[in-house]
Amino acid sequence: MAERRMGVIINGATGRMGTTQHMANLLAIAAEGGLPLENGDRLIPELLLVGRDAGKLKALAAAHSNQRWTTSLDEAFAAPDRVFMDCAATGDRPRRVKQAIAAGKHIFIEKPTAPTVDEAMALARLADRAGLKHGVIQDKLFLPGFAKLLSLSQSGFFGRILSVRVDAGSWIFDGTDRECQRPSWNYKKAEGGGLALDMMAHWRYMIDRLASPIIGVCALMSTAIPQRVDEQGKPYAVDAEDTNYALLKLENGAVGMITNSWATRPRRDDTMVVQIDGTLGSAAAGRFRCYTQSAAETPEAFTAAARPGGVDLMAPWREVPDTGPHKNPFRQCWEAFLRHLAEDAPYLPTLVEGAKAVQLADLAYRSVAEQKWMEVADLRL
């Protein structure tokens, strides 16, 4: 057994995702002696943290065994580290990824991969022509609840799928009295902000894999909270949408619906719930729990529900049990991509899949502007 080391550049390391997900999970892999490979070797990631604030970077690095750090992307690209992870603001991502490709780095980035589908596909083609391996984070289907939902779909539990419904969001404070839970760039178009651009990336791969590929979209969006306060306590005008509602046509004939808002107070099991209805049964899943109702367990609710206390609609739902411990979804993404690099194991969410996610957001924006249904065309290199 040999130890193999692989340098990973994390750009945006001091941000929430960079610190709590990417850095934390890569350090956990290293702390456990590395990622075991098929030949018995262990792959140990070594980090190079990149950000704009030297003070924050220095403190972060010192708090985690004195990791290497720099405020210069040029310096990072000149280093021998082989992988570039970008989890900084979306707006300037294409430029940074192009620099990384020119430096010969393998690309593994957060979604959305670019502000527009044309830019996203350009990155995919550029990385492919350079002979580099590339991928995008798709973490949600590794969450326990959605993993169970995917297993049900793959097992044929639903029979013919009729519909899929996504209900997601929560109240994001405006920063006046309580700190905003999302960075201010999320609300600025020029910096890659917008709820649809951010979250359609998830809904695309989730619905494609849970139910059927999306072939049409019709959307409606709004800006519910027009003014917010940024990280420095300064008010700013919001020019990006914070609500997104969409109807979808799926390839298998099913219908999809997305209700997504950063200005809602949820009364449901989770901030993010996906329900699939089929001829043989239904299932509803949040991030951590999943419930099913088979055709045989379906109550007669149409008339009974009209009477007070007539029927308990929650009673016929059964929770899907856990089958074992679950790893952090981002760690599972990293392990899969590191194996892709080290031993050519498959990694399906390439930059083309990332572009498909941006495509759905692009078409949703066009649907709003043109007030009509948009066809979702196939994307290929």
Residue ranges and their predicted role:
Residues 229-231, 236-237, 245, 249-250, ...:
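C-terminal glycine/acidic-rich active-site capping loop/insertion
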Residues 159-163, 366-381:
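C-terminal capping/lid region of NAD(P)-dependent oxidoreductase domains
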Residues 38-39, 68-79:
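Short acidic low-complexity segments
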Residues 140-238, 371:
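Predominantly a Rossmann-like dinucleotide-binding segment in NAD(P)-dependent oxidoreductases
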Residues 198, 209-216, 221-224, 229, ...:
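Glycine-rich, aromatic-lined ligand/substrate-binding cores of catalytic
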Residues 81-83, 89, 94-141, 156:
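Beta-strand-loop-alpha-helix segment that lines the small-molecule cofactor/substrate pocket
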Residues 88-89, 260:
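Short glycine-/small-residue-rich Rossmann-like dinucleotide-binding loops
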Residues 1-64:
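N-terminal Rossmann-like dinucleotide-binding module
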